[in-house]
Amino acid sequence: MKHTALLLLLLCSLTLQAQDAGLKVLDHSDFLIWNTIQDRQIAADGRIVTYRLVPGEGNPTLKIYDATTTATSQIQRVSKSTIDYDGKFIFGLITPHRDSLRALERKKVEKKEWPADTLFITSGVAGSVLRIPNVAEYKYPAKKGDWLAYSIKPQTVPADTTKEKDATKEKKKSKKEIVHLIVRQLSTGLEDTLRNVKEYVWAEKAAMLVAVTASSDSTETAGVAYWSNHEWQYIKKQKAEYAKLSLAMDGNQIAFLGNPDTTKAQVQPWELYYFDFRTDSATSIAAKNKSALPLVSQHAEPRWSEDGKYLFYGRAQMPVIKDTTLLPDEIVDVEIWTTEDKEIYPVQNVKKAQEEKRSYTYVYDTQSKQHTAICSPAWESAVFTPDRNGRFVMVYTDQPYQKESSWTGDARKDLAKVDLLTGAVIPFRKGILTNPRISPGDKFAYGYSDIDSTWWTYQFATGTFSLMKRDGLPSFYDEENDVPTHPNSYGIAGWIKDDQSLILYDRYDMWAWSGEGSKAPVTLTKGREQKLVHRYIKADAEEKFLSPSAPWLIHLKDDTNKSTGYSWFNPSSFSLDSAYVLSDFEHSRQVNKSRSADTYLFTKENFATFPDLQLSGDRLKTSVKISDANPQQKQYAWGSIQLYHWMDWDSVMRTGLLVLPPGFDTLRSYPTIVNFYEKSSDELHNHPTPAPHRSTINYAFYASRGYVIFNPDISYKIGLPGESAYQIVMSGTSSLVNDRIADRENLALQGHSWGGYQIAYILTRTNMFKCAEAGAAVVNMTSAYDGIRWETGKGRQFQYEKEQSRLGKTLWQDPNLYINNSPLFKINKIETPLLLLH
């Protein structure tokens, strides 16, 4: 009671200080008014930027910014918006008021009875806003401007301008949940209507749309129709079920699935249909047969190569037929676990629905009219180039290694290439632990080999497999790895055009590797000496490869003080623009470039600065802030943050984050919350937007209310995770007390999951803290060791042996290791008041 009164008195005095300065103290109700920025977009010419302000509670607002006039307009309650490909129009959906929807929810009104959204269309800040009510959804060609399709409920359909007047009268309402589809040309306002639509899709680069219609009575047509030049044309009128519509990118070819069987047979005879505008109707090109994969899969969506040559689809095995003659009490329902299974039963159970829909990829060559198997039960997965134009495809299987993955956590793979010209499947690597990929030019398969801790390539043309030589070079894997398993790579930037080189990362620099094992990679940057991290930014969303001549946008980060900035790298001269400036902000690595102009959209933030949008028209030399998401922040007492360094008990220099309350007085000590997980110092300049969180505290909130927050970086010793955390947390907290920053009498711990475990362990070793909260803490590693993660079905053993728990041995190899690291067995030593959250 005495301690509680003291803490309340301290908080009251700190609150009064903030009030004396004329500033508010953050309260829980403030979480509701703080905005986040979502769905930012920039037009092709860089003139228009849109984004949504979404409050903690309430209706979102779409903001439209015009870079030419610097004017901003807004539309309330927008849940989704799009700038068309040409950048001339903005459209989206306006939802009913949130309060109205919540009232319907409280009355338990079914969602299908809720009021529909309203479609809006505008040309920009100064343009008028057209509103069309009762819209279910909209779609548009991803890379073709001026066109939009939207669906509405039947009772609100306007007259169809493509039909005779007497045909526009409303027919008897269908019992089916069907919509009417309206295609609109944005520049003219002309609209065409197709009634009773079940499904529709646009071509990506053309004003071409295909739809499935249903008949509500004898006067209407059911089938598949395409729309072009303001006309609808049916390409399949047979009464059947149609699905999985797909258009080639240029709109010149159409594929879809059809099922003419109207019975309820367990096995439905789906067929693949193809249409290329040289015929009057679509024709079946794949159907049920007597092969090992007899069925066309209804679950695999047909997909086109970018050049339209290849059509990829799925075939499937015959499913197990249910015996419908059995009574419910005659059906056996039992789980059988056996050591002979490739995967443990819970994994099988999780995968059951997926396996029932399993399909194997085939390809139809539209030029040769040949079908080629890519995948099979022996090679169940495929990897393609992004455009799928290439002659070669990589396939892989993890089946031989599924059993061992039960205790390793990850399955190794066998790899093979498929030649689409010949259909030949040629294995080229067994038992490699990797995430395989294909270079954009289709010359190499490649990936990072976890076991070898290096990159590999396989040259399709020569059949040569190579591991990258790294003798005498820095590590291309995590230098700070403190987990008893293979370290992760630092990743890649991508490939230079025509697969000339693969651009790799080490801890600080970028390297170019030709992909040939006989050649070592060449360093492109010189960041290691300065501890300056170089990372490539893909600002162009449509970019497939790195240019061999045009400058690359580079994100720079000082690994010591965490300052960041941007620069440009010249790939021709291997030189970095030295005019870069780093500042105490986190400059985002998500940068959006307008497609046809050198205009860039990005954010920068720090503890006190919200990540508002910045727009630059001079290649990021300068920028203008174009949003002001939370102007109310200036009314509140806000803390500050810095790096804190101290010497631990082993005389090793340690680092952590130290958040200080507003008006921090060096002559006073403050109540302190120690909150940590693993390492967080890289987040020095992240902005703590006030918001509730399921597992951690909000730093801005507690700083505003007078707390110091300490977040130490934890470095782990294998086999001693709890003790590692104890020594670093205790030495760091003691240092704060000795520096008279932290009040020795008012210290607290807070953490969740892995952080919760570490807190539970620390409390068995010390009574230094006044109170603690641990969420989802595993306190008994012996019982948790054989647990199951039900979302994946996998066992948890490998998590303790070789992943986050870092014990490094099995329970049977060293049972005391598990006991000593389990707080449960020392719980009698805990005297600190502890709040447990589960």
Q: What is the predicted function of each stretch?
A:
Residues D471-V483, D628-N746, Q750-S753:
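Cap/lid segment of the alpha/beta-hydrolase catalytic domain
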Residues L7-L8, A18-Y600, E605-P611:
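Beta-propeller folds
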Residues H299, D452, Y490, D499, ...:
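Active-site lining segments that contact anionic ligands and/or coordinate catalytic metals
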Residues M1-G22, V778, G787, G795-Q797:
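Bacterial Sec-dependent N-terminal signal peptides
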Residues T689-H838:
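Active-site-proximal cap/loop segments of hydrolase catalytic domains
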Residues L257, G314, Y396, V418, ...:
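Generic beta-strand/beta-sheet core signal
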Residues S123, Q185, G189, Q614-Q632:
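Short, structured interface segments
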Residues F460-F476, G517-K531, S572-S573, D618-T622, ...:
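Active/binding-pocket-proximal capping segment
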